[in-house]
Amino acid sequence: MAEENQTPATATEEQQAVLQIQRIYVKDISFEAPNLPHVFQQEWKPKLNFDLSTEAKQLGEDLYEVVLNISVETTLEDSGDLAFLCEVKQAGVFTISGLEDMQMAHCLTSQCPNMLFPYARELVSNLVNRGTFPALNLSPVNFDALFMEFLQRQEQESQNAESSTEVQH
């Protein structure tokens, strides 16, 4: 009888947030050292160019693929010769549900890449090591700060667009 007095869960109740890793994998990997062994005969004064980006796409209901793209290009300061170019696309499939739009954006551009970064960092380090170059240990990335910068840029662009629209009237 006590069970009859309980109300069943309704669709309007808040859904609990879910973030689960389904799979982590290497989507693409490349290591190029076109000027070997010539660069080994020069003084090692590297100039490092590091690029990072993310991509996300929905695969199905509550299922998303997130790709973390890392590119490290190292040239020698004195000669400008390319020492190596290392590109890694570390990806993961995630189950994500119960999030508002802004929370979902944060999850796809910050939380998921944060989970992928250690795998990508290890790949880059191993590839550089296999090329017999000095160790390269990428510093941790604050994806939350990058997400906040992105939001601020969007807000600034929105304000600039509104200002130019007001001036045209």
Swiss-Prot record:
It is found in: Cytoplasm. Keywords: Chaperone, Cytoplasm, Protein transport, Translocation, Transport. One of its GO terms (cellular component) is cytoplasm. Coiled coil: none annotated. Its main location: cytoplasm. Pfam families: SecB (PF02556). GO terms for molecular function: unfolded protein binding. HAMAP family: SecB (MF_00821). This is Protein-export protein SecB. The lineage of its organism: Bacteria, Pseudomonadati, Pseudomonadota, Gammaproteobacteria, Pasteurellales.
